[in-house]
């Protein structure tokens, strides 16, 4: 279902909000947009923005994984690349846009490529600027 939703969002970007509704509420997504402002990968800030679960939700989803620390805003094009390309997925892991199983979103920084800044997210829809990892 999730793969179909991503493909749908890529084919019809203006209807990406339909896909978004399957993962987070409109009210929650508005909070993500207020926090993130644009796609953390390319910087675009249009109607193609979607929530990217940093740690996969798995089949059937998980409420725990829908916490604000586990969601970053990206455009539907970037989301599709992260989910379909091994190379893009590995890059997304390096920058915190995707997390491996077992990684804690609260302690895993995420890179805003548009701003050139690393952030930590909390579960109250806040972001805190941090130094680059490593």
Segments from the language model and where they lie:
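Short Cys/His-centered divalent metal-binding micro-motifs
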Residues: 47, 68-94
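Short flanking/linker segments adjacent to small metal-binding domains or redox-active Cys/His motifs
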Residues: 99-134
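Short cysteine/histidine-rich metal-coordination sites, predominantly Zn2+-binding motifs
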Residues: 54-60, 90-100
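Short, surface-exposed beta-edge/turn micro-motifs
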Residues: 36, 69-72, 107
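Short cysteine-rich loop/turn motifs with clustered Cys
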Residues: 23-50, 75-78
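Short linker/helix segments within small regulatory modules
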Residues: 56-70
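Short, charged low-complexity linear segments at domain edges
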Residues: 11-24, 43-60
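Arg/Lys-rich, low-complexity, intrinsically disordered N-terminal tails that contact nucleic acids
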Residues: 2-28, 130-134
């Amino acid at each position: 279902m999730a793969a179909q939703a991503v493909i749908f969002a890529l084919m019809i970007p203006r209807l990406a909000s339909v896909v978004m509704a399957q993962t987070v509420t409109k009210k929650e997504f508005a909070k993500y947009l207020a926090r993130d402002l644009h796609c953390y990968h390319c910087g675009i800030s249009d109607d193609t923005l979607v929530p990217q679960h940093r740690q996969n939700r798995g089949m059937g989803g998980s409420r725990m994984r829908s916490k604000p620390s586990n969601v970053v805003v990206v455009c539907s094009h970037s989301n599709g690349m992260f989910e379909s390309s091994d190379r893009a997925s590995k890059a997304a892991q390096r920058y915190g846009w995707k997390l491996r199983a077992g990684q804690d979103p609260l302690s895993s920084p995420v890179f805003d490529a548009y701003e050139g800044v690393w952030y930590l997210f909390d579960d109250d829809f806040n972001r805190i600027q941090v130094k680059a990892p490593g």
